[in-house]
C-alpha cells in the first residue's frame, strides 16, 4: 500500500503574481503524495488556475473533493464527510495578518476567530511586501484529515491540515486544541523534532472558513520506506530493522521522561475550563515561560469520539476526564462507561423507530450485555498495588501516550535527523494500559524459534512453512521493540509480561471497537480471563480477593459467543475489503469496476461478483 500512499506530485514552481494582491491567480494542484514529504516528479499532476477573489470558481470544487478511494456502501455520504472546502482567499489574508504580529512566546493569540503561535512567526520568512500564497498542492488524503502544501512568495512552505467531518464539532475542536498543545509541548519542553505550529482554528468561524492546523513543512522521505518486517534473519536484516525501530524507541523514551499530575490530555492553559487552570500538569518546571503554558483537560483518546456522533456531549463529558493521578482505575472504567452509554443511546433510537430493523436491535442488545460485563470487570482487571508486578507504582503513573508512533509518521529530514508527525488522539494514561506501536505489535501465537517451537517444520510444504515464518517474524519484531524498551526503561519492562497483556486485553479491545460486531472481541478477551482467574487472585495480579470469576457465563452463552465470533472472523476474511471497511484505493476501484468485478446495485452501492473475483482475484489494500 505504501506505493499507493506515496503517490507523487509535480515539483512546485512559483508563479508570478497577476495584478494586485488578492487578485493574483493561485495554482491549485490536486495530485497526491505523502504528508509533508518530497517525492519524485510526476506528470500526472492536475493544475488549476484560479483568482483568489473568485470564490465561486467551479474549477475549485475538485480541489476539495475526496479522491483517494471509494467505498462499497454509502460512497457518496462518506466522500461528503471528507470534503475539505476552505477559503483560499481567506488563507492568504490570514497569513499576511500573522506576519504583522510581534514574535514572542505566549499563549496562542486570538486572530480573526483562529489562534496564532506568534513565537513561530519566522516560518513565514521575510519580505518587505505582503506575504502571499503562490500555490497550493494537495499532498495527502489521510484517514482523518487532508493535507495541503502552501508555497509563499517568501520561498517558505507550510502545511495546511483540514480535518474530515467524521466527528461532532465539539470533538473536532477538542482534538485540534489538544494536538497543537501536545506538539508544542514536545517541541518546547522536550526539544523533540516535530513540526512547529503557526496557527490553528477549531471551527469554521475564521478567515479560512474551516477547522485547521497551519504548520511547518518538513521535507524528506518516510522512514516507512526502510521498514521490511518479513525479511529472513541475517546481520543485514537486523541492521535494517533497527534503523526503523531504534529512532521510534528513542522518541518514546524521551516522551516517557515526564510524569504528569493527572490523566487526560494536554491543552494550552487558556483552552481548558477555569476549574482546571490552577493545576500544573507536572512538577518541577523552572522555565517561567513554560510554567503556565499547558494544562491537562479531558481525554481525546479516540474511543471518546469514534462513532459517538449520536451521543449527547453532556454524557461524553461525564466520562472523558480528566482524572486524578491517584485513581488509575477510573481510566479503565471510563471506556466501559462510554461504550455502554453509546450502545444504550443507539438502542433508544432504534426503539423509537417503528420501522427499525430487528437485527439491528438484537445486535445492539448484545453489545449492551458485553459492555455491562466490561463495566463490571474493569475495576478488577489489574491491581495497581500488586507486589507481583515489578515497579507497579511506576507503571501506573500518568505518562504521555501517542497512539500513532509509526514509521509512516516519521520523516527522514537528513541522514541523522528524523521528524515525527501526527499526534492526534494523544492522551496521558498509565503506561501499563498502553499498547505497542501497531507496526511492531503482534497478538497472535508466538514463535521464538522455528525449528524448536514448530514440530516437523523442516518437512513441511513451502506454503505451510511460510505461515509459520510469518508468525516468527512478527514475534521477532515485537521482541526487538521490547528489547529497546528494556534498554531505555527497564523500570517499565513489566508491560511485556504475557499475563499483563491478557489482563488488559478487554480494555484494549474496547479501545479498538470500530464496527458493530467488534464487541465479540471484547467479550472474548473477558472470557479468556476465566480460566486463569484463581491464579491471578492468588498472585495478587487482579484487584480482587474473590476467586470466583466476576462474570457468570452459562455453557449455552459461551457456545453461542464462540459460534458468533467464528462466524464474524470467517465473514471478515472471506469478504473482500472487509478489513478496510469496504474502502478501496481509487485506481484499484476503477480497475475492478472496468473488469466487472465490482457491480453497482440499484441502491447505488457496489457488490463483488464472486465468479469474476475467482478469475482475477484483487489484492487486499492495507487499512487506511
Curated annotation (Swiss-Prot):
Disulfide bonds: none annotated. Residues 1-34 form a transit peptide. Transmembrane segments: none annotated. It is found in: Mitochondrion. Keywords: Mitochondrion, Transit peptide. InterPro entries: Kinase-like_dom_sf, Mito_inheritance_9. Gene3D superfamilies: Phosphorylase Kinase, domain 1. One of its GO terms (cellular component) is mitochondrion. The keyword Mitochondrion applies. Belongs to the AIM9 family. PANTHER family: ALTERED INHERITANCE OF MITOCHONDRIA PROTEIN 9, MITOCHONDRIAL. This is Altered inheritance of mitochondria protein 9, mitochondrial. It comes from Candida albicans (strain WO-1) (Yeast). The gene is AIM9.
